[in-house]
Swiss-Prot record:
First-tier enzyme category under EC: ligase
Native source species: Streptococcus thermophilus (strain ATCC BAA-491 / LMD-9)
Entry keyword set: Aminoacyl-tRNA synthetase, ATP-binding, Cytoplasm, Ligase, Nucleotide-binding, Protein biosynthesis
Name this polypeptide is given: Arginine--tRNA ligase
Pfam families xref list: Arg_tRNA_synt_N, DALR_1, tRNA-synt_1d
Gene: argS
Enzyme Commission number(s) of this protein: 6.1.1.19
Location of the protein in the cell: Cytoplasm
'HIGH' region, short sequence motif: residues: 121-131
Lineage: Bacteria, Bacillati, Bacillota, Bacilli, Lactobacillales
Quaternary structure note: Monomer.
Aminoacyl-tRNA synthetase keyword on record: yes
Length: 563
């Protein structure tokens, strides 16, 4: 139970007319520390109790059980509560030390599945910073819900089907080399794709040839299928190398192609339920009653199924396979109309579990204020970006700590962590401008800043040769340590807020605040000096490092012990 919950519970005993949650929401932090740590305004009770707020405040202050607090006093219409800092710090430090990385674990999820549709790069196209957002936001949310007791299922819905494969097959048969593709799959396939598109602009017969090869692929032609499978496999080898660098793994790589034989069932159900209407030769589902102006296009006039039909098949398959409590689609903001249609069609089909599906949208990454585009060449590729970030991290580590062992591994943790943290500290609906210098800086609100605070604490603990005892009671009541204690106590609430809002930036901002509070404490306090508080100060360091490391882990960022 955190401080606000404790206060609300005590006030609710005296004033049963108010719900505990309402009391919690009314609690304020006084502007002046002399007025207590938290204050409860009695105005809202005046109508209910038919008394002046000043009298109500005096009554509550007199009747409340103050044994958990330093003191409780009424000042005008406010009940001012002074917390027992020594007691609270002992409780919080005791919990963190006893539970370690499991501090703030919960069982809200009760082992139920949450399916994450995430990352989803296109086969034979390079993995760009644009794909990074979906990957790291979803991975962090998956870690956060796992801490709440859910079981995340990470699904990489690969872009592994479509007419572009007809183009690729034509290009490969004209100019391709097995050796070149194996040596550098994505780059080689991209070059072939760009070259064939340029030729198609000059020669319309190329388009027809590509369409013919895609028709063969759809019909299961042996040569077309073998080439498609090979392009997919080679691309996946390269993607997996990048995912390994990012420290991200998946439970399923079922992409678009996986649902080829599952779309007929969707069309059959829609037909059976009388939901399909004809519109200019195409088959559509009208969604006006959901306030959606444009109908969902299920089948084109030539009988070809569409993107939404595939997503409907995927939703049905995932519900049957994983029986998810929630399905989270971490996909760019520009897809919001598509997901509204998807949920509405499922609702029309009678699947009320569509209410458990959420589109977690995010803003764009820009470069120098301009939108990124593979076609226009304004693209930031992930692989060279990681390499550059690691090099810059290594240069800073060399300058700060030239004799550090495992420099390469630490530079990798810092470089990759810097890119991920910068993305995750941004409110997901906001985009950000890509700036590698800002990302890899050890100053400011960055991943390396938080990692360095953790490494600094580990250095202090090594110097002191300190391991906390489970039997000891550690408590502090100075101003600087209190700022840290309040943050540590708030960690369980932070996790719930991040999960409820699908917002990893809440955890990233918490990690920054905790690192800043510790650095302030470090500047004001002689931690290692012999004094009666020495062990309690070291216990505070230990607890701070534990929670910093866990917050970073939730974001998919490593916390090196040395930097």
């Amino acid at each position: 139970m955190n401080t606000k919950e404790l206060i609300a519970a005590e006030i609710a005993k005296v004033v049963p007319e108010l719900e505990q949650e309402n009391i919690q929401n009314l609690l304020e932090i006084p502007k002046n520390a002399d007025m207590g740590d938290l204050a409860f305004p009695a105005f809202s009770l005046a109508k209910v109790l038919r008394k002046a707020p000043q009298m109500i405040a005096a009554d509550i202050a007199e009747k409340i059980d103050a044994s958990n607090f330093e003191k409780v006093e009424a000042v005008g219409p406010y009940i001012n509560i002074f917390l027992d800092k020594s007691k609270i710090s002992a409780d919080v430090l005791g919990q963190v030390i006893a539970q370690g990385s499991h501090y703030a674990d919960q069982n809200i999820g009760n082992g139920r599945n949450i399916a994450f549709d995430m990352s989803s790069p296109n086969i034979a196209k390079p993995f760009s910073i644009g794909h990074l957002r979906s990957t790291v936001i979803a991975d962090a949310l998956a870690n956060i819900v796992a801490k709440q007791g859910y079981k995340p299922v990470r699904i990489n819905h690969l872009g592994d089907w479509g007419k572009q494969f007809g183009m690729l097959i034509v290009a490969y048969k004209k100019w391709g080399s097995e050796e070149a593709v194996k040596a550098n799959p994505i780059n080689e396939l991209l070059q072939l794709y760009v070259r064939i598109n340029a030729e198609a602009e000059e020669d319309p017969s190329v388009d027809e040839e590509a369409r013919e090869w895609f028709r063969k692929l759809e019909a299961g032609d042996e040569e077309a299928t073998a080439l498609w499978q090979w392009f997919r496999d080679e691309s996946l080898v390269e993607f997996n190398r990048l995912y390994d660098e990012l420290g991200v793994s998946f439970d399923s790589y079922n992409g678009e192609a996986f649902y080829n034989d599952k779309m007929d069932e969707v069309v059959d159900i829609l037909t059976e339920k009388g939901l399909l209407q004809e519109s200019q030769g195409a088959q559509v589902v009208n969604l006006e009653k959901y306030g959606i102006e444009h109908p969902a296009l299920i089948k084109k006039s030539d009988g070809a199924t569409l993107y939404i039909t595939r997503d409907l098949a995927a939703a049905l398959y995932r519900k049957r396979t994983y029986d998810f409590a929630k399905a989270i689609y971490v996909v760019g903001n520009e897809q919001s109309a598509h997901f509204k249609q998807l949920k509405a069609v499922l609702k029309e089909m009678g699947y009320n579990w569509s209410d458990d599906m959420t589109h977690v949208a995010f803003g764009l990454v820009t470069k120098n204020g301009k939108k990124l585009s593979t076609r226009k060449g304004n693209v930031i590729l992930l692989e060279p970006t990681i390499a550059e970030a690691v090099n810059r991290a290594q240069a800073q580590i060399e300058a700060k700590n030239p004799n550090l062992p495992n420099k390469e591994a630490i530079a990798h943790a810092v470089g990759v962590g810097a890119i991920k943290f910068y993305d995750l500290k941004t409110d997901r609906m906001n985009g950000y401008d890509f700036d590698l210098d800002a990302m890899v800086s050890f100053e400011g609100e960055t991943g390396p800043y938080v990692q360095y605070a953790h490494a600094r604490i580990q250095s202090i603990l090594r110097k002191a040769d300190f391991t906390p005892s489970a039997d000891a009671t550690y408590s502090l009541n100075d101003v600087e340590s209190w700022e840290i204690i309040k943050l540590l106590q708030d960690f369980p609430r932070i996790i719930n807020r991040a999960s409820d809002n699908f917002e990893p930036s809440i955890v990233a901002k918490f990690a920054i605040s905790l690192a800043q509070a510790f650095n302030k404490y470090y500047a004001h306090t002689r931690i290692l000096d012999e004094s009666p508080e020495r062990d309690s100060r070291l216990a505070l360091c230990y607890a701070t490092a534990t929670v910093l490391k866990e917050a970073l882990r939730l974001l998919g960022v490593e916390a090196p012990d040395e930097m």
